[in-house]
Design a protein with these regions (language model features):
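Flexible, glycine-rich loop/tail regions that form catalytic "lids" or insertion modules at the edges
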Residues: 40-43
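Aromatic- and Gly/Pro-rich donor/ligand-binding loops
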Residues: 61
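Generic structural marker for isolated residues within well-ordered, non-membrane alpha-helices
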Residues: 76
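Conserved PLP-enzyme active-site core in the AAT-like
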Residues: 2-28, 35, 45-51, 55-58, ...
């Protein structure tokens, strides 16, 4: 079976194949840029693993309390090194991105505090976490208020509105990198960095948290490179490289991450407990592969979008 016959057996006609190849040829410059980002991110991950001397002993399974789990602890050091943060919490006990975000929010907001979302309304799954829709154990039920500043029509941050919205009760600023289910564009890391600098100039003490879901390794930098106090995401998405079967991460300042660890487990326990249950090989290998896997996904999305654009959509 030759190449054309192989595609034909999959239901791909010669006409469709030639059309796809022509689109791919036009996309070569765009793909080169995506591959350059992947190379930079791959070097970042390799450097983090070398710095923390990842070896076979870190793949050992643990059960029970998980005390002295060196594989788990070292994976967190790898994440902190790769994302240039003081600390990281990377656990299979974090079930999804929404769970990670809920931990980060509830750990760093106290009764009487305000959460201010400056990229518009967050994901639908956070509505009950915040209390926009009634739910037991929401931030609203615990006395945390919510404020929101929508993006401008062009998708940029509304800095005058952010300045007006900031007040003495504002403890945490929330930025959602991905467009989620909204028609707005995804926010670039450079734009997020500009927003972080603006907020920190007005309120150096405010905690800036970035929902980084779907954004890891898409660009050469992460929001943590521009001063985010926390970046939060899911291992089921980009950083798991398609291998992590479960898990989430929170990377940021030592103070913020410590509070998140106490919220995940219990005060006094923090990061000392949490067995890895034999998942370390998948979590290490997934993170190693993530830059390549993400670049492939981005190229696939760009290719399909270009195809449909040429077809008149």
């Amino acid at each position: 079976m030759n190449r054309d016959e192989m595609y034909l057996s999959l239901g791909v006609s010669d006409k469709v194949l030639q059309f796809g190849e022509a689109v791919l040829d036009e996309l070569k410059p765009r793909f080169a840029g995506i591959e350059e980002i992947a190379e930079l991110n791959q070097a970042k991950v390799i450097g983090a693993m070398q710095k923390n001397r990842v070896n076979a002993t870190h793949f050992a399974a643990s059960t029970g309390y998980g005390y002295d789990d060196e594989g788990r602890d070292n994976l967190e050091r790898v994440y902190a090194s790769a994302f240039h943060t003081e600390a990281a919490l990377v656990r299979p006990q974090i079930t999804c991105g929404t769970h990670a975000l809920a931990i980060a929010l509830s750990a760093n907001l106290l009764p009487g505090d305000e959460m201010l979302a400056i990229s518009g309304k967050p994901y639908d799954t956070l509505e009950e976490v915040i209390g926009l829709r009634e739910s037991p154990c929401s931030l609203k039920e615990y006395g945390v208020s919510y404020g929101q500043v929508d993006l401008r029509e062009d998708g940029s941050f509304d800095f005058p509105a952010i300045e007006r919205a900031l007040n003495d009760k504002t403890k945490l600023i929330h930025i959602q990198r991905s467009k989620g289910y909204c028609p707005r564009p995804t926010i670039s890391v450079d734009a997020i960095g500009e927003a972080i600098a603006f907020c920190k100039k007005l309120r150096p003490d405010v905690v800036v948290m970035v929902d980084n879901c779907y954004g890891e390794f898409v660009e050469a930098n992460e929001p943590s490179d521009f001063g985010a106090d926390m970046i939060v995401g899911s291992l089921i998405k980009n950083p798991g490289g398609g291998l992590a079967p479960i898990g989430g991460y929170i990377c940021g300042t030592q103070k913020c991450v410590d509070r998140c660890a106490y919220r995940l487990s219990a005060p006094g326990l923090g990061q000392e407990v949490g067995a890895n249950l034999g998942l370390m090989p998948a979590l290490y290998q997934g993170f190693f592969l993530a830059p390549s896997v993400v670049s492939g996904a981005v190229k696939g999305a760009v290719f399909v979008a270009a195809c449909y654009e040429k077809l008149g959509f």
